Every structure is written in structure tokens, then in C-alpha cells.
């Protein structure tokens, strides 16, 4: 699933007030009646519908006793993200109907507006939509209106760019901990004690590198990638010399 469908900054100029909404315990709070109604609209096979319903309502053990479940989807199952997206597709459609700029990745989403007044209005209306239509509780303590420089999203951050006569422009960057995570993975693969053939080591590096770059491809990463590439080349040379 893509984080951004277009680069925030290309056509996003002036969107400086972010509505950050935290869905409280999303997977545990999914309302079965709302979800099943949406599934019934899409799936016509009675057997499939019956299996989904049984899977959703399978009893869970609490304090040694089995209890029926009327809300929530089991985390860790491959079905859970699919069913959750069926529910949150209604949110996507509502935001698109309002012609709002937004980013959603699973239950993590934010809406971008041009003023605090608009942000407050949009935030209140979406709070009502989530509660009334989807029956999803909102964590008000973790929700609010943010400025780009104070906001993080899935390893990304925004830093202001300063140009004479231009205000409200931000550059999309990658957070330090995301860079550190990539470097740790590369370091593990290039340890000389790892019993990899050289071709195997290169393949593993390529998988990690390309996966990370694809995830953060819309951020400003070229300069740091060049520096990281030089560091990686030196480690690979050391692996060859140590053979």
C-alpha cells in the first residue's frame, strides 16, 4: 500500500494545518454489524459470507472463559487488513467527496488544510462521520491540529524550505530512526562473519536497499543515499579482502 500517491509539495503548497486523527484501538473496535453490512454489498457467495461471519465472531478467552465477540478483528491474520480496508474505504470516499487532501495507511491517516479554521471545521465533521457512520471511537488526547514541522508520518517528516517571497513550502524528509534502521540492516548483511557467498550477499543487500528506497522514494533522500552508498561500498570491499 502506498503512503503517498503524489509528492506532498507538488500541488500541496500552502497546506500548513494538519488534522491528525488517532483511531482508538482500531482493530479491537471494528463494529461487526457495520463491517458485515459492507461485506454483504460486495460478496454474494453465501458460504464465503458465513465463513467470514464465523471467523469474526469466534469466541475469545478472557480470564479463562470463552466470550462471544461482537466487535474487533483478530490482529495478525491476513484477513484483518483486507476487512479493515473495506471499512475504511468509506472514509476514503467521504474525504474524496469533500475534495480534501489526505494520506491514509491502514488506520493511520491525516488531512491537510490551509488554515486552522478549516482544520477545526474538517476535524469536527470527520469526528462525527467516524462516530456516526463507522462507529469508530477517536482518541482525542492523541488527535489534534498539527503544523508540518511538528508532525511525523510513517517514518517521514516535514522541514520548512526558505525562499525569498515564498511561504508555506515544506520538504519531505526521512526521519533519523528510519535511516538508522536501514543502516543496521545493511551492516548485518555485510558483516564478514556472515557465511554468505558474494552473489548472495549482493542479492540480500539489493532486496533491503530497493525495498527501503521504494518506501521513501518521494522524500529528499538522494544526497544521503550517495553517502550511504560510499559507506556500503567500503564494507563490501572489506568483505572481499577478508575472504
How would you label these PLM feature ranges?
Residues 54, 58, 85-90, 207, ...:
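Short, residue-level hotspots on alpha-helical faces of the histone-fold
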Amino acid at each position: 500500500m502506498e503512503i503517498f500517491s503524489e509528492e506532498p509539495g507538488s500541488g500541496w503548497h500552502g497546506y500548513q494545518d494538519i488534522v491528525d486523527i488517532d483511531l482508538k484501538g482500531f482493530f479491537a473496535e471494528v463494529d461487526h454489524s457495520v463491517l458485515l453490512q459492507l461485506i454483504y454489498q460486495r460478496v454474494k457467495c453465501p458460504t464465503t459470507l458465513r465463513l467470514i461471519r464465523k471467523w469474526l465472531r469466534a469466541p475469545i478467552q478472557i480470564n479463562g472463559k470463552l466470550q462471544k465477540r461482537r466487535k474487533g478483528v483478530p490482529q495478525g491474520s491476513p484477513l484483518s487488513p483486507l476487512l479493515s480496508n473495506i471499512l475504511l474505504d468509506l472514509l476514503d470516499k467521504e474525504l474524496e467527496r469533500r475534495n480534501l487532501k489526505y494520506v491514509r495507511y491502514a488506520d493511520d491517516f491525516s488531512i491537510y488544510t490551509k488554515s486552522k479554521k478549516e482544520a477545526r471545521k474538517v476535524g469536527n465533521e470527520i469526528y462525527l462521520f467516524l462516530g456516526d457512520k463507522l462507529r469508530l471511537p477517536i482518541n482525542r488526547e492523541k488527535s489534534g491540529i498539527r503544523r508540518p514541522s511538528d508532525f511525523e508520518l510513517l517514518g517521514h517528516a516535514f522541514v520548512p524550505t526558505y525562499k525569498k517571497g515564498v511561504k508555506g513550502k515544506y520538504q519531505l524528509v526521512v526521519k533519523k530512526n528510519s535511516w538508522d534502521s536501514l543502516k543496521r540492516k545493511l551492516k548485518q548483511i555485510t558483516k564478514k562473519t556472515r557465511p554468505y557467498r558474494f552473489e548472495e550477499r549482493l542479492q540480500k543487500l539489493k532486496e533491503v536497499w530497493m525495498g527501503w528506497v521504494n518506501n521513501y522514494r518521494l522524500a529528499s533522500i538522494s544526497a544521503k543515499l550517495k553517502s550511504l552508498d560510499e559507506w556500503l561500498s567500503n564494507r563490501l570491499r572489506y568483505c572481499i579482502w577478508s575472504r
